[in-house]
């Protein structure tokens, strides 16, 4: 029986239920992919590992999957050396044939590589922070950013300037991922080009993501759609481009005066003043 270890950025719903935690509202493609693979290849033994805010490691067996929750001492965007011992324990206990790290944006998967090696490891690209960091301001000028700094930004030391720097630091860790692993999974010519530039010796595998079931249950129909609506799946920071959509709205409204913008997720502005970000302002 093949043994596959997934390293993810979220806690899956099953262990969330065991721990009394709210289930994540994002990353649904990973759950759908896990369910689809288990149906197609029931002989594969799966384990899913991630980090959580706690003091001890937990192992949960449910629905035929083993879940490992590793205690994180620091913010997951920074490297946590204490995770290396836990990863060695997971590796020795589960003995995976293949390790699949979902995403290179966070540092906990890199701790596995440093502790256990990369010979049987592949990573899949969810976004390349080392590249995105270059464009983090997304056309905002120095003055645009400076004049909109809020109380929340100052207290948390989290202006758009600092956010860009954090992306750059995460990008340094991401490049170590990509330079080390022999196999990389992606789905666009954009990520393939950047992977080749960083590690031309890695073997690139094209693979589209599996969406949540709801995306396959209904079809878009013009007669039933909310016409002249622009939908943004995220808008919490500059690279998602909300400010560019707003800049374009006068031109759009000239031709389609009933145009609406809908944004998924929490409001950027409907909150106390001390919680509004500079970008939300």
Explain the meaning of each model-derived region.
Residues 1-55, 61-66, 252:
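N-terminal subdomain of nucleotide-sugar transferases
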Residues 4-7, 98, 115-156, 185, ...:
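Active-site proximal beta-strand in glycosyltransferases
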Residues 40, 115, 243-257:
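Short hydrophobic signal-anchor/transmembrane segments that target glycosyltransferases
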